[in-house]
């Protein structure tokens, strides 16, 4: 009889597209993962994957098994959640810790897909101003997964989601001109900026890129809320540095890439042995997270 662990190994290979990435995601060795899949293939009497040089594809047997294996793993997760719920634990709730800008940008679309597949699993979103408090929340066991800039020295699992660009928002009218979607930050040295409150994750980002351009930013307004920055810029207060993912499609100002460039790596971090629900969420996040919205990319081109 196939085991849930074998099904999980098989499904993770499908989700990740290779045995190497699947082993990294599950926190096991590649030979150990291959043994789990091989045991499942022996149990079923057929191969599940066609091994290609850099990827894998499903055989007819592998495709036939897929919906049933997912149903088994999902049913096991629901059974575990139900049992723990009766016991008074927090099962059945996915706790997501995220940097403010992540909650505004990439998470809404991912959560829409997640809720469609897991309508009975509650989601609790815990938002943080800095990577330090985000990491501390994970270390204290307050969240199942954290999403933000890659934390240094994290001892659990780290799934890199990609590189997030920080862009400069400028008021609709007035100098300086934006050329080919770029602007030298040094041209904004004498302009008062929309800055963030001390301790906010993006306050340090603006200070760092301005320092690289040879100036210290003057401040017109400080805001606690990342979502407020585009509104202040559109009102003509001054420029702001924001993650590309939080720029609303309705933004009426101008958008430019800063020179020098500003970007950061985003990752999802979990404990060393995340449960099935958390692992499934991280896999979905890695597949569907959008770090550069099409409407922003179009205006930068």
Model-identified regions with their sequence ranges:
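Central regulatory/effector-binding core of bacterial HTH transcription factors
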Residues: 91-153
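Alpha-helical linker/hinge and terminal dimerization helices associated
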Residues: 7, 11, 43-44, 65-87
